[in-house]
Amino acid sequence: MTGRDSASSDITPEVLLRAYACGIFPMAESVDDPTLFWVEPERRGIIPLDGFKVASRLARTVRSDVFTVSVDRAFKQVIDGCAAPQPGREDTWINRRIRELYIGLYQLGHCHSVEVWQNDDLVGGLYGVNLGRAFFGESMFHRARDASKVALVHLVARLIEGGFVLLDTQFVTEHLRTFGATEVPRRRYRAMLDVAITGAADFARLPTEQPIAGTRALAIISGREGLGRG
């Protein structure tokens, strides 16, 4: 289900949060399209946090800490990276208004980024929205092999440790299926969302001011480490 809103200037970050709580999110046709449209898929993409899969080769990369991973250090750079053309993805749905809205959510503490660095270069990352115990993944990018995958691994470890119960990917791609992504019908998704937005999670339960070792992220995902999660 989609609906176009030509008066996108009337959409505020607060309106956006209410939309997420109802299971809908905005997109644009292209970077040059000034309007937004609302989307509520018939089948919703999610990654079950207790079923997240990390391939052995990727696990070796994560464990090696060849990249440095940070959180909320370069949000605007990440959203710009996601908006830039990628191999196999020449067009983007992130227009100027989308960028403004999500920067607004970031300033309100409801949007976060995970950055992946190689030396001092930003080579990958992702961003998304948090509401209650739900996290809505918006977009990711990479400029080095496996950089966005490493960002996703660190995100999932943070969500598990922080008490989140829903990771919404909106849609499912073959790439996301390798991590365990699946589709659920709209009615089931709404029930999951209602539970997830009730209560609170802590995105900063793991430290945000210093990098987390890859071995620790993998241990959290596998259930071998905890900080007293209830």
Curated annotation (Swiss-Prot):
EC numbers for this chain: 2.3.2.6
UniProt subcellular location: Cytoplasm
Biological function: Functions in the N-end rule pathway of protein degradation where it conjugates Leu, Phe and, less efficiently, Met from aminoacyl-tRNAs to the N-termini of proteins containing an N-terminal arginine or lysine.
Pfam families xrefs: Leu_Phe_trans (PF03588)
Top EC class, one word: transferase
HAMAP family named in the record: Leu_Phe_trans (MF_00688)
Listed InterPro entries: Acyl_CoA_acyltransferase, Leu/Phe-tRNA_Trfase, Leu/Phe-tRNA_Trfase_C, Leu/Phe-tRNA_Trfase_N
Coiled coil: none
Protein name listed in UniProt: Leucyl/phenylalanyl-tRNA--protein transferase
MF annotations from Gene Ontology: leucyl-tRNA--protein transferase activity
Family statement: Belongs to the L/F-transferase family.
Assigned GO CC terms: cytoplasm
Lineage: superkingdom: Bacteria
Major localisation: cytoplasm
UniProt keywords, alphabetically: Acyltransferase, Cytoplasm, Transferase
Gene: aat1
Chemical reaction(s) catalysed: N-terminal L-lysyl-[protein] + L-leucyl-tRNA(Leu) = N-terminal L-leucyl-L-lysyl-[protein] + tRNA(Leu) + H(+); N-terminal L-arginyl-[protein] + L-leucyl-tRNA(Leu) = N-terminal L-leucyl-L-arginyl-[protein] + tRNA(Leu) + H(+); L-phenylalanyl-tRNA(Phe) + an N-terminal L-alpha-aminoacyl-[protein] = an N-terminal L-phenylalanyl-L-alpha-aminoacyl-[protein] + tRNA(Phe)
UniProt record, GO biological process: protein catabolic process
